């Protein structure tokens, strides 16, 4: 990750107005986010699947520190997706089992830097797309309506530069 060519390539993305989805599954991936942010400050990044958060002990631990470091960069967003498969309990996960992590992330990044993702077709492995979206929407409904809209579609529209018209 520290090769000059990597940063040059990421700068090309940024210069073209494109974004970078960070598919992080461990600490070593996440520790690159602030480094990339420093080397390519104009690059917009999104952390896919909340970087596979821990579900076992209920504390943010190293994952939480990694997310705090990422959230320090205003060009980094968090994609709330893939949590059913990340939970390790593909059949038994529920909105209740992911609620705390989702709210923790929204509180950390703010609704304007969180976006909903479906993780289809992978979500099929953990109960399906409808189960995932229903669980996320149930959790988002505990937030003000403006935050629900922001997370459900407005953040993604702004981040990826798309419009409804």
Give residue ranges: language-model regions.
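Mid-to-C-terminal alpha-helical segments outside catalytic/metal-binding sites
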Residues: 103-104, 108-115, 124-165
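Active-site glycine-centered loops adjacent to acidic/histidine catalytic or metal-binding residues
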Residues: 119
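Short, active-site-adjacent cap segments at secondary-structure transitions
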Residues: 85, 122-124
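Catalytic pocket-lining loop regions of alpha/beta-barrel enzymes
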Residues: 3-115
């Amino acid at each position: 990750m520290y090769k000059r060519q990597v940063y040059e390539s990421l700068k090309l993305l940024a210069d073209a107005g494109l974004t970078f989805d960070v598919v992080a599954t461990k600490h070593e991936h996440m520790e690159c986010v602030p480094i990339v942010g420093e080397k390519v400050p104009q690059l917009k990044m999104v952390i896919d699947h909340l970087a596979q958060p821990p579900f076992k002990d209920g504390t943010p631990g190293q994952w939480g520190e990694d997310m705090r470091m990422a959230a320090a960069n205003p060009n980094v967003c968090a994609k709330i997706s893939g949590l059913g498969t990340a939970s390790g309990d593909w059949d038994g996960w529920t909105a209740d089992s992911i609620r705390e992590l989702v709210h923790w992330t929204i509180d950390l990044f703010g609704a304007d830097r969180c976006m909903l993702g479906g993780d289809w077709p992978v979500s099929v492995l953990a109960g399906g797309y409808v189960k995932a979206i229903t669980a996320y929407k149930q959790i988002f409904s505990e937030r003000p309506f403006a935050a629900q809209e922001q997370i459900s579609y407005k953040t993604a529209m702004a981040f990826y530069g798309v419009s409804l018209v």
